[in-house]
Amino acid sequence: MKRRPLLAAGLTLTLAIAASACGSSSKFGDPDAGGTGGEDGGTFNPGDAQVRDPIGSLSGRVLAPEGTIPISNALVYLVAAPPAPFPDGVFCDKCVVLDKSVPSTFSKADGTFELPAYDEGMQYLVVQKGQFRRSRPIVVGKGKQTVPDGMTKLPPRKNLAVPGGGTDEIPKMAVVTGQWDKIEVSLAKLGLGAIKPGFLGVPEVDRSTIAFDMIDNPSGFLDNEAALSKYNIVFIPCSFSSGTTCSTSSPAGNPSVKTALQNFVAAGGKLYTTDYSYEFMRQPWPGYVDWVGQTNQLGSACQGGEYDSPAMANDPGLAAWLSAIGISNLQTQANWTTIDKVNPKTGKDKDGNTVTVSPKVWVTSLNTPSGAKPATVSFEAGCGRVLFSTYHTEAMNNGLLPQEQALLYVLLEVAVCTTQEAPR
């Protein structure tokens, strides 16, 4: 399934769509908001407002690890000590309400925030989106203070003993490697590693620098529950394919692979798949999403050619973020599968209760060969989430494409805590 490089406009849509693709609604602030860690290493949502008058405020911007991309709906708050670390490996990140004595706010679509302060002296400023979290000591005084970007930039890797005080945490991620959809390069461009020239000058990651694991033997990984449980996010991009076949989808039909992926997500893991790897969503979780052309045969929904389409961001938070980074004309480019529709199904929530799960459509391609159809969808399964996009990131140069920025948005959204409310 050889692909051409995507154009920036189309890339933007892909990223933006996927970016919003996962997360649970919160009754605090914007529904796309993530949380922040608590004493048990879990995640907080803001509580009720303070009853005191503030003595001042802290203002700044929340940025991606690479230092320029704004992060919307990140939780920002002040506490007396850094939050306890997240648990190692997969865990059920349930939202907990911050005590009303804790000053907190969310960043806007352009990443800016203004946080009220109620006490003077040394405190810790915490910035978190999903399981990306940074805490830094700060001396709070009366009046308005501007916070340096370095204190509110999401961390590029884990460090629980930052010189000068504070902590950095990121989710543990695994990328299944292959021929196509080099998500690892996009992750590196977003600040999670370094890239170097590869064959014919096409960029590749410098594996000695990356903050995630690359899985070169998926057949020995995807059916291994113990191996999967070491991670918070697993990427299965359109990677294994050769030519225009779906031969690499076959591992998804293995009962041990299906069971391992189901258990990983139910325990709190996040699974991200793209186009020809759609079977890794369809086989473990049948019926939530229907694809055009699908039959009982593995790979039946794979198309022999690609298509581009103008698109629409269905989610208001995603649309606002795209506008904030200057993207107005959405497109999905190099789609190799087409979603027909999503379906409500009976499933389990994070506590094992039987619920109706309705997949969320984040982006719609408006002009597919079958008309307007979903392009990025997600749903919750147990305590985790599953995300799929009909297109993928194409990393053919050293520049940071809009779709690669959207990939960051995806990472953050799939890692937010789960609530009692409807899945997103």
Task: Please report, for each region that a protein language model flagged, where it lies by residue.
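Catalytic beta-strand/loop cores that center a nucleophilic Ser/Cys/Thr
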Residues: G305-G399
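Ser/Thr-rich, Pro/Gly/Ala-heavy low-complexity intrinsically disordered linkers and tails
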Residues: L7, T14-S57
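Structural motif
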Residues: R61-S72, V79-A84
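Short, acidic Ser/Thr/Gly-rich low-complexity loop/linker segments typical of extracellular
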Residues: P82-P116
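A glycine-rich, often tryptophan-bearing local segment used as a flexible ligand/cofactor-contacting loop or short
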Residues: S242-T346
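Extracellular ligand-binding/catalytic regions of CAZymes and related secreted enzymes
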Residues: R282-A301, S370-A375, E380-R424
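A short, solvent-exposed beta-strand micro-motif common in secreted/extracellular proteins
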Residues: V76-L78, G111-E114, E120-P137
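Helical hinge/lid and interdomain linker segments adjacent to catalytic or ligand-binding clefts
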Residues: V175-V289
